[in-house]
Amino acid sequence: MRKLSSLVCGAGAGLAAFYLSRLRDPQKAAHSSWTNSEKPVDACGLWDSNWDCRDPRLMVRPLKNTQPEEENRFNADLEKAKPKKARHIILVRHGEYLDVGESDATHHLTERGRKQAQFTGQRLSELGIQWDKVIASTMVRAQETADIILKEIKYDKEKVVNCVYLREGAPIPPQPPVGHWKPEASQFYRDGARIEAAFRRYFHRAYPDQDKESYTLIVGHGNVIRYFVCRALQFPPEGWLRISINHASITWLTISPSGNVSIKYLGDSGFMPVQYLTNRIPRDAKNVV
């Protein structure tokens, strides 16, 4: 009987150790009712810690050997290369505008769009943020939105960076496809490279010498912002069109020193009265999309 008891205890301990080792396997997902517990996490579901190509371990001279002096040198260099503070990137979509005329020069904000921008500027002012940088798309509707916001947040217009890379466009063919919006393949080819370049320019972890958390305000466009959100969170970028954000809404992303990215707001417009909540061009405008 004692032998049988020992055998059962030993088998139980071995089984427990087996399941514990499986739980610790980094390739296993946290299981929900719809997942297959025997299937490893798909590669696209794993976080790429070097998404911005600024992993500190890859920014320093690698170890030549395992001597203590060399290891001390490597660790000292690594510590110097590590970011210390977070970067906050706040994205604001332009206000409602009229798609009138054949060029961007005639696409001005509506009266409601101007009021939306004012509400957003007031909201940003209430947050009490000290802005390190303000960047705006060069398109008229984004410029007009930025001008209104600048007055509310008391930011010098001369310091604003105007960026052509942030102009509206077709970032990547959406999945699932939609029938009402079908740009030519050449437009995706042209716009996609530009918008991706904008993402790489503005989205990265802090530099090692940054000694305080930084706040960057970007005033841009719906397609660009939605693509940025998918890219920053490492969601499939083809899903950008499944997201809807209102005019003059606020999206807030934070890049931590480790390179991890989190989202605080997505298309926040709850600070506006309900009659100012819009996300499409007015019906009486030309080329409604």
UniProtKB/Swiss-Prot annotation:
It is an enzyme of class 3 (hydrolase). Its main location: mitochondrion. It is a single-pass membrane protein. The keyword Ubl conjugation does not apply. GO terms for cellular component: mitochondrial outer membrane. SMART domains: PGAM. It catalyses: O-phospho-L-seryl-[protein] + H2O = L-seryl-[protein] + phosphate; O-phospho-L-threonyl-[protein] + H2O = L-threonyl-[protein] + phosphate. Its EC number is 3.1.3.16. It is found in: Mitochondrion outer membrane. Disulfide bonds: none annotated. It holds the Pfam family His_Phos_1. GO terms for biological process: positive regulation of mitochondrial fission; positive regulation of mitochondrial fusion; protein dephosphorylation; response to anesthetic; response to heat. The chain crosses the membrane at residues 7-23. GO terms for molecular function: kinase binding; phosphoprotein phosphatase activity; protein serine/threonine kinase activator activity; protein serine/threonine phosphatase activity. Keywords: Hydrolase, Membrane, Mitochondrion, Mitochondrion outer membrane, Transmembrane, Transmembrane helix. It comes from the Eukaryota. PANTHER family: PHOSPHOGLYCERATE MUTASE-RELATED, SERINE_THREONINE-PROTEIN PHOSPHATASE PGAM5, MITOCHONDRIAL. Displays phosphatase activity for serine/threonine residues, and dephosphorylates and activates Pk92B kinase. Has apparently no phosphoglycerate mutase activity. Interacts with Pk92B/ASK1. Belongs to the phosphoglycerate mutase family. BPG-dependent PGAM subfamily. This is Serine/threonine-protein phosphatase Pgam5, mitochondrial. It comes from Drosophila ananassae.
